[in-house]
Amino acid sequence: GWEGCFFQAGSCPGTCTHVWNYAQTVANLFPRLEQNMRETEFLRETDGQGKMNFRAKIQLEGKPWDMYPAVDGQLGSILRVYREWKISGDDDFLKKIWNQVVSALEFSASYWDSNQDCVLDGQQHNTYDIEFYGVNSLGNSIYYAALKAGAEMAEYLGEHERSQKWRSMEQAGCKRMDEMLFNGEYYRQVTDGDIDEYKYQYGEGCLSDQLLGQTLAHLYGLGHLFPEDHVKSAVFAIYKYNFKERMGSHKSLQRGYAYQDEPGLLLCSWPSGGRPKQPFVYSDEVWTGIEYQVAAGLIYEGFLQEGLEIVRAVRSRYDGYKRNPFNEVECGNHYARSMASWGVLNALSGLQVDLPHNSVTISPKVNQDCFSSFYSTGTEWGICRQFKDQSGALIQSFEALYHAD
Protein backbone atom coordinates (compact mmCIF):
# COMPACT_ATOMS: atom_id res chain seq x y z
CA GLY A 1 0.00 0.00 0.00
CA TRP A 2 0.95 3.64 -0.45
CA GLU A 3 1.54 5.80 2.60
CA GLY A 4 -0.76 8.39 1.06
CA CYS A 5 -1.65 9.84 -2.33
CA PHE A 6 -0.88 13.01 -4.25
CA PHE A 7 -3.10 14.49 -6.93
CA GLN A 8 -1.39 12.65 -9.78
CA ALA A 9 0.31 9.68 -8.10
CA GLY A 10 0.71 7.70 -4.91
CA SER A 11 2.97 8.84 -2.09
CA CYS A 12 5.73 6.54 -0.84
CA PRO A 13 5.06 2.94 -1.97
CA GLY A 14 5.70 -0.45 -0.44
CA THR A 15 3.50 -0.60 2.69
CA CYS A 16 6.15 1.17 4.75
CA THR A 17 6.50 -0.78 7.98
CA HIS A 18 7.25 2.18 10.24
CA VAL A 19 4.16 4.07 9.02
CA TRP A 20 1.74 1.14 9.07
CA ASN A 21 3.09 0.45 12.58
CA TYR A 22 0.51 2.93 13.88
CA ALA A 23 -2.47 1.80 11.80
CA GLN A 24 -5.09 -0.40 13.50
CA THR A 25 -8.11 -0.09 11.21
CA VAL A 26 -7.25 -2.64 8.51
CA ALA A 27 -6.31 -5.32 11.05
CA ASN A 28 -9.67 -4.95 12.76
CA LEU A 29 -11.83 -4.72 9.63
CA PHE A 30 -9.89 -6.67 6.98
CA PRO A 31 -7.67 -9.01 9.02
CA ARG A 32 -6.72 -11.32 6.16
CA LEU A 33 -5.26 -8.36 4.28
CA GLU A 34 -2.97 -7.58 7.21
CA GLN A 35 -1.92 -11.24 7.35
CA ASN A 36 -0.93 -10.96 3.71
CA MET A 37 1.18 -7.90 4.53
CA ARG A 38 3.01 -9.84 7.23
CA GLU A 39 3.63 -12.72 4.82
CA THR A 40 5.16 -10.27 2.34
CA GLU A 41 7.33 -8.64 5.01
CA PHE A 42 8.70 -11.88 6.45
CA LEU A 43 8.67 -14.30 3.51
CA ARG A 44 9.68 -11.86 0.75
CA GLU A 45 11.33 -8.81 2.31
CA THR A 46 13.39 -10.40 5.11
CA ASP A 47 16.78 -11.80 4.11
CA GLY A 48 18.63 -14.83 5.46
CA GLN A 49 20.20 -12.82 8.28
CA GLY A 50 16.87 -11.40 9.45
CA LYS A 51 17.18 -7.89 7.99
CA MET A 52 13.80 -6.64 6.76
CA ASN A 53 13.22 -4.07 4.03
CA PHE A 54 10.88 -1.44 5.43
CA ARG A 55 9.39 -1.04 1.95
CA ALA A 56 8.33 -4.00 -0.18
CA LYS A 57 11.03 -3.44 -2.81
CA ILE A 58 11.50 -7.10 -3.71
CA GLN A 59 7.76 -7.65 -4.08
CA LEU A 60 7.33 -4.53 -6.25
CA GLU A 61 10.63 -4.32 -8.15
CA GLY A 62 12.11 -7.80 -7.87
CA LYS A 63 15.47 -6.64 -6.54
CA PRO A 64 17.20 -6.14 -3.16
CA TRP A 65 17.25 -2.74 -1.47
CA ASP A 66 20.49 -1.35 -0.08
CA MET A 67 19.00 0.68 2.77
CA TYR A 68 19.23 0.59 6.54
CA PRO A 69 16.56 -1.48 8.28
CA ALA A 70 14.06 0.56 10.30
CA VAL A 71 14.14 -0.25 14.00
CA ASP A 72 10.52 0.74 14.66
CA GLY A 73 9.23 -0.84 11.45
CA GLN A 74 11.00 -4.20 11.79
CA LEU A 75 10.18 -4.67 15.46
CA GLY A 76 6.67 -3.38 14.90
CA SER A 77 6.13 -6.00 12.20
CA ILE A 78 6.98 -8.71 14.74
CA LEU A 79 4.38 -7.20 17.06
CA ARG A 80 1.84 -7.14 14.25
CA VAL A 81 2.38 -10.86 13.62
CA TYR A 82 1.32 -11.32 17.23
CA ARG A 83 -1.70 -9.06 16.68
CA GLU A 84 -2.78 -10.89 13.53
CA TRP A 85 -2.42 -14.27 15.23
CA LYS A 86 -4.41 -13.15 18.28
CA ILE A 87 -7.17 -11.59 16.18
CA SER A 88 -7.51 -14.59 13.85
CA GLY A 89 -6.53 -17.59 15.96
CA ASP A 90 -4.81 -18.86 12.81
CA ASP A 91 -1.99 -21.16 13.94
CA ASP A 92 -1.12 -22.04 10.35
CA PHE A 93 -0.42 -18.37 9.61
CA LEU A 94 1.93 -18.16 12.59
CA LYS A 95 3.75 -21.39 11.79
CA LYS A 96 4.17 -20.37 8.14
CA ILE A 97 6.29 -17.33 8.99
CA TRP A 98 7.63 -18.28 12.40
CA ASN A 99 11.20 -19.05 11.36
CA GLN A 100 11.54 -15.63 9.76
CA VAL A 101 9.99 -13.97 12.80
CA VAL A 102 12.68 -15.62 14.93
CA SER A 103 15.37 -14.53 12.48
CA ALA A 104 14.11 -10.92 12.44
CA LEU A 105 14.02 -10.67 16.23
CA GLU A 106 17.46 -12.23 16.67
CA PHE A 107 18.85 -9.89 13.99
CA SER A 108 17.41 -6.92 15.88
CA ALA A 109 19.07 -8.02 19.11
CA SER A 110 22.48 -8.26 17.48
CA TYR A 111 22.30 -5.39 14.96
CA TRP A 112 21.02 -2.57 17.20
CA ASP A 113 22.41 -3.68 20.58
CA SER A 114 26.12 -2.94 20.37
CA ASN A 115 27.15 -4.38 23.75
CA GLN A 116 24.42 -7.01 24.24
CA ASP A 117 23.04 -5.46 27.42
CA CYS A 118 19.43 -5.77 26.18
CA VAL A 119 19.23 -2.04 25.38
CA LEU A 120 19.29 -0.91 21.75
CA ASP A 121 21.89 1.80 21.21
CA GLY A 122 23.11 1.52 17.61
CA GLN A 123 22.26 3.57 14.54
CA GLN A 124 18.47 3.36 14.38
CA HIS A 125 16.65 4.44 11.23
CA ASN A 126 13.05 5.31 12.06
CA THR A 127 9.78 6.84 10.96
CA TYR A 128 11.16 10.39 11.10
CA ASP A 129 13.30 9.52 8.05
CA ILE A 130 16.54 9.92 10.02
CA GLU A 131 18.71 7.83 12.34
CA PHE A 132 18.62 8.06 16.13
CA TYR A 133 21.84 7.26 17.98
CA GLY A 134 22.36 6.08 21.52
CA VAL A 135 19.51 4.93 23.75
CA ASN A 136 15.95 6.11 23.12
CA SER A 137 12.60 4.77 24.27
CA LEU A 138 10.90 4.86 20.85
CA GLY A 139 12.90 1.94 19.47
CA ASN A 140 13.46 0.23 22.80
CA SER A 141 9.82 0.23 23.91
CA ILE A 142 8.83 -1.48 20.65
CA TYR A 143 11.76 -3.90 21.10
CA TYR A 144 10.57 -4.99 24.53
CA ALA A 145 6.98 -5.35 23.35
CA ALA A 146 8.26 -7.50 20.45
CA LEU A 147 10.33 -9.64 22.85
CA LYS A 148 7.33 -10.13 25.13
CA ALA A 149 5.09 -11.03 22.19
CA GLY A 150 7.79 -13.29 20.76
CA ALA A 151 8.12 -15.09 24.09
CA GLU A 152 4.38 -15.75 24.20
CA MET A 153 4.32 -17.08 20.64
CA ALA A 154 7.38 -19.26 21.26
CA GLU A 155 5.81 -20.71 24.40
CA TYR A 156 2.60 -21.48 22.49
CA LEU A 157 4.63 -23.30 19.82
CA GLY A 158 6.46 -25.35 22.42
CA GLU A 159 9.80 -23.53 22.16
CA HIS A 160 10.19 -23.09 25.90
CA GLU A 161 13.91 -22.34 25.96
CA ARG A 162 13.56 -19.59 23.36
CA SER A 163 10.55 -18.20 25.19
CA GLN A 164 12.47 -17.98 28.46
CA LYS A 165 15.44 -16.35 26.75
CA TRP A 166 13.34 -13.61 25.19
CA ARG A 167 11.35 -13.08 28.37
CA SER A 168 14.56 -12.64 30.35
CA MET A 169 15.89 -10.18 27.76
CA GLU A 170 12.66 -8.20 27.88
CA GLN A 171 12.63 -7.96 31.67
CA ALA A 172 16.32 -7.04 31.93
CA GLY A 173 16.09 -4.51 29.11
CA CYS A 174 12.96 -2.80 30.43
CA LYS A 175 14.59 -2.33 33.83
CA ARG A 176 17.83 -1.02 32.39
CA MET A 177 16.19 1.36 29.91
CA ASP A 178 13.92 2.75 32.61
CA GLU A 179 16.94 3.42 34.82
CA MET A 180 18.86 5.06 31.98
CA LEU A 181 16.17 7.26 30.45
CA PHE A 182 13.46 8.18 32.98
CA ASN A 183 14.24 11.68 34.23
CA GLY A 184 11.60 11.75 36.93
CA GLU A 185 8.87 12.90 34.54
CA TYR A 186 9.36 11.32 31.10
CA TYR A 187 11.77 9.26 28.98
CA ARG A 188 14.57 11.17 27.24
CA GLN A 189 17.31 10.14 24.79
CA VAL A 190 20.90 9.47 25.91
CA THR A 191 23.85 9.51 23.50
CA ASP A 192 27.58 9.15 23.98
CA GLY A 193 28.96 12.67 24.28
CA ASP A 194 27.31 15.92 23.24
CA ILE A 195 23.86 15.58 21.66
CA ASP A 196 24.98 17.95 18.89
CA GLU A 197 27.62 15.50 17.70
CA TYR A 198 24.79 13.96 15.68
CA LYS A 199 22.20 15.68 13.54
CA TYR A 200 18.47 15.11 14.04
CA GLN A 201 18.35 13.87 17.64
CA TYR A 202 16.10 15.04 20.49
CA GLY A 203 18.13 14.48 23.67
CA GLU A 204 16.34 16.02 26.67
CA GLY A 205 13.17 16.51 24.65
CA CYS A 206 9.73 15.13 25.47
CA LEU A 207 9.00 12.95 22.43
CA SER A 208 5.33 12.21 21.73
CA ASP A 209 6.29 8.74 20.47
CA GLN A 210 8.49 7.98 23.48
CA LEU A 211 6.19 5.12 24.59
CA LEU A 212 4.78 3.97 21.26
CA GLY A 213 5.78 0.40 22.13
CA GLN A 214 3.87 0.65 25.42
CA THR A 215 0.71 1.81 23.64
CA LEU A 216 1.03 -1.07 21.17
CA ALA A 217 1.55 -3.45 24.09
CA HIS A 218 -1.72 -2.28 25.63
CA LEU A 219 -3.57 -2.59 22.32
CA TYR A 220 -2.33 -6.16 21.83
CA GLY A 221 -2.92 -7.34 25.39
CA LEU A 222 0.68 -7.40 26.63
CA GLY A 223 0.18 -5.08 29.60
CA HIS A 224 2.72 -2.74 31.16
CA LEU A 225 6.36 -3.02 30.10
CA PHE A 226 7.75 -0.38 32.47
CA PRO A 227 6.83 0.74 36.01
CA GLU A 228 3.21 1.85 35.85
CA ASP A 229 3.82 5.10 37.72
CA HIS A 230 6.62 6.04 35.30
CA VAL A 231 4.41 5.27 32.30
CA LYS A 232 1.57 7.38 33.67
CA SER A 233 3.95 10.25 34.37
CA ALA A 234 5.47 10.07 30.89
CA VAL A 235 2.20 9.95 28.94
CA PHE A 236 0.80 12.84 30.96
CA ALA A 237 4.00 14.81 30.31
CA ILE A 238 3.44 14.32 26.58
CA TYR A 239 -0.01 15.88 26.95
CA LYS A 240 1.23 18.60 29.31
CA TYR A 241 4.13 19.78 27.18
CA ASN A 242 3.28 18.84 23.59
CA PHE A 243 -0.45 19.54 23.33
CA LYS A 244 -1.26 23.11 22.33
CA GLU A 245 -4.82 24.43 22.66
CA ARG A 246 -3.87 26.89 19.96
CA MET A 247 -0.75 26.92 17.83
CA GLY A 248 -0.53 30.70 18.14
CA SER A 249 3.07 31.80 17.99
CA HIS A 250 4.53 28.28 17.69
CA LYS A 251 7.34 28.44 15.17
CA SER A 252 7.81 25.73 12.56
CA LEU A 253 9.86 25.84 9.38
CA GLN A 254 8.46 22.51 8.21
CA ARG A 255 5.08 21.41 6.90
CA GLY A 256 2.04 23.10 8.42
CA TYR A 257 -0.83 20.86 9.53
CA ALA A 258 -2.24 23.16 12.25
CA TYR A 259 -2.36 26.97 12.28
CA GLN A 260 -3.17 29.99 14.44
CA ASP A 261 -6.12 29.19 16.74
CA GLU A 262 -6.12 25.47 15.92
CA PRO A 263 -5.10 22.91 18.57
CA GLY A 264 -2.64 20.10 18.01
CA LEU A 265 0.00 17.80 19.50
CA LEU A 266 3.61 18.55 18.58
CA LEU A 267 5.94 15.65 17.85
CA CYS A 268 8.45 16.91 20.42
CA SER A 269 9.15 19.77 22.81
CA TRP A 270 11.94 20.77 25.19
CA PRO A 271 10.21 21.93 28.39
CA SER A 272 13.46 22.28 30.35
CA GLY A 273 15.66 23.44 27.48
CA GLY A 274 18.36 21.41 25.80
CA ARG A 275 16.92 21.59 22.30
CA PRO A 276 19.64 20.37 19.88
CA LYS A 277 20.97 22.79 17.30
CA GLN A 278 19.50 20.55 14.59
CA PRO A 279 16.71 18.42 16.09
CA PHE A 280 14.94 15.82 13.98
CA VAL A 281 13.33 17.60 11.08
CA TYR A 282 9.66 16.92 11.86
CA SER A 283 9.82 17.78 15.56
CA ASP A 284 7.71 20.95 15.25
CA GLU A 285 4.99 19.33 13.13
CA VAL A 286 1.58 17.88 14.07
CA TRP A 287 0.72 14.38 12.76
CA THR A 288 -2.74 12.91 13.26
CA GLY A 289 -1.41 9.34 13.49
CA ILE A 290 0.77 10.27 16.45
CA GLU A 291 -2.05 12.28 18.01
CA TYR A 292 -4.31 9.23 17.91
CA GLN A 293 -1.72 6.84 19.34
CA VAL A 294 -0.96 9.27 22.18
CA ALA A 295 -4.69 9.64 22.83
CA ALA A 296 -5.01 5.86 23.08
CA GLY A 297 -2.03 5.72 25.43
CA LEU A 298 -3.56 8.39 27.67
CA ILE A 299 -6.86 6.49 27.82
CA TYR A 300 -5.13 3.24 28.76
CA GLU A 301 -3.31 5.02 31.59
CA GLY A 302 -6.51 6.54 33.01
CA PHE A 303 -6.30 10.02 31.47
CA LEU A 304 -9.62 9.74 29.65
CA GLN A 305 -10.44 13.43 29.28
CA GLU A 306 -6.94 14.32 28.11
CA GLY A 307 -7.04 11.56 25.49
CA LEU A 308 -10.44 12.66 24.23
CA GLU A 309 -9.30 16.28 24.12
CA ILE A 310 -6.58 15.32 21.64
CA VAL A 311 -9.11 13.42 19.51
CA ARG A 312 -11.45 16.42 19.54
CA ALA A 313 -8.53 18.62 18.51
CA VAL A 314 -7.90 16.48 15.42
CA ARG A 315 -11.55 16.46 14.45
CA SER A 316 -11.86 20.22 15.00
CA ARG A 317 -9.17 20.74 12.38
CA TYR A 318 -10.79 18.28 9.96
CA ASP A 319 -14.26 19.69 10.51
CA GLY A 320 -15.57 19.64 6.94
CA TYR A 321 -15.16 23.40 6.62
CA LYS A 322 -11.43 24.03 6.84
CA ARG A 323 -10.43 20.51 5.74
CA ASN A 324 -11.97 17.35 4.34
CA PRO A 325 -13.22 15.32 7.35
CA PHE A 326 -12.44 12.07 5.53
CA ASN A 327 -8.88 12.97 4.50
CA GLU A 328 -6.29 13.38 7.24
CA VAL A 329 -3.11 14.56 5.54
CA GLU A 330 0.56 13.89 6.23
CA CYS A 331 2.87 12.99 3.33
CA GLY A 332 -0.05 12.95 0.93
CA ASN A 333 -3.81 12.65 1.21
CA HIS A 334 -5.63 9.87 3.10
CA TYR A 335 -2.44 9.10 5.00
CA ALA A 336 -2.09 5.56 6.37
CA ARG A 337 -0.74 6.54 9.81
CA SER A 338 -4.08 8.20 10.56
CA MET A 339 -5.59 4.73 10.87
CA ALA A 340 -4.16 4.77 14.38
CA SER A 341 -7.60 6.22 15.15
CA TRP A 342 -9.09 2.72 15.50
CA GLY A 343 -6.77 2.22 18.46
CA VAL A 344 -8.73 4.91 20.31
CA LEU A 345 -11.93 2.87 19.88
CA ASN A 346 -10.26 -0.26 21.23
CA ALA A 347 -8.75 1.72 24.12
CA LEU A 348 -12.19 3.08 25.05
CA SER A 349 -13.85 -0.35 24.89
CA GLY A 350 -10.86 -2.19 26.34
CA LEU A 351 -11.39 -4.85 23.68
CA GLN A 352 -8.97 -7.76 23.87
CA VAL A 353 -9.21 -10.54 21.28
CA ASP A 354 -7.30 -13.76 21.97
CA LEU A 355 -8.76 -16.37 19.65
CA PRO A 356 -5.88 -18.86 20.12
CA HIS A 357 -7.20 -19.15 23.69
CA ASN A 358 -10.89 -18.66 22.76
CA SER A 359 -11.20 -15.37 24.62
CA VAL A 360 -12.84 -12.06 23.71
CA THR A 361 -13.31 -9.50 26.49
CA ILE A 362 -13.99 -5.81 27.00
CA SER A 363 -13.07 -3.41 29.79
CA PRO A 364 -14.86 -0.14 29.00
CA LYS A 365 -13.30 3.15 30.05
CA VAL A 366 -16.61 5.02 29.63
CA ASN A 367 -20.23 4.26 30.59
CA GLN A 368 -19.23 1.10 32.47
CA ASP A 369 -22.79 0.52 33.74
CA CYS A 370 -24.39 0.78 30.30
CA PHE A 371 -21.88 0.39 27.49
CA SER A 372 -22.23 -0.73 23.89
CA SER A 373 -19.83 -0.58 20.96
CA PHE A 374 -18.82 -2.21 17.71
CA TYR A 375 -16.34 -5.06 18.04
CA SER A 376 -14.56 -7.25 15.51
CA THR A 377 -12.32 -10.29 15.45
CA GLY A 378 -10.75 -12.25 12.62
CA THR A 379 -13.89 -14.35 12.29
CA GLU A 380 -16.84 -12.12 13.22
CA TRP A 381 -18.09 -8.65 14.00
CA GLY A 382 -21.00 -7.28 15.96
CA ILE A 383 -22.03 -5.36 19.07
CA CYS A 384 -20.42 -5.79 22.48
CA ARG A 385 -22.24 -4.65 25.62
CA GLN A 386 -21.63 -4.25 29.32
CA PHE A 387 -24.48 -3.51 31.72
CA LYS A 388 -25.66 -4.06 35.27
CA ASP A 389 -28.33 -6.66 35.92
CA GLN A 390 -31.00 -6.37 38.62
CA SER A 391 -28.58 -7.59 41.29
CA GLY A 392 -26.04 -4.94 40.35
CA ALA A 393 -23.59 -7.40 38.78
CA LEU A 394 -21.79 -6.35 35.60
CA ILE A 395 -22.73 -8.49 32.62
CA GLN A 396 -20.92 -8.62 29.26
CA SER A 397 -22.45 -9.86 26.02
CA PHE A 398 -21.32 -10.14 22.42
CA GLU A 399 -23.91 -10.13 19.64
CA ALA A 400 -22.33 -11.38 16.42
CA LEU A 401 -23.96 -9.78 13.37
CA TYR A 402 -21.61 -11.52 10.94
CA HIS A 403 -19.59 -14.71 11.28
CA ALA A 404 -17.21 -16.03 8.63
CA ASP A 405 -17.82 -19.56 7.40
Regions inferred by a protein language model and the residue ranges of each:
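Active-site-proximal structural scaffolding
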Residues: T15-V19, A70-S77, V101, N136, ...
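Repeat-solenoid scaffold signature
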Residues: Y156-G205, G213, H218, L222, ...
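Amphipathic alpha-helical scaffolding segments
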Residues: N99-S103, A234-A237, R312-S316
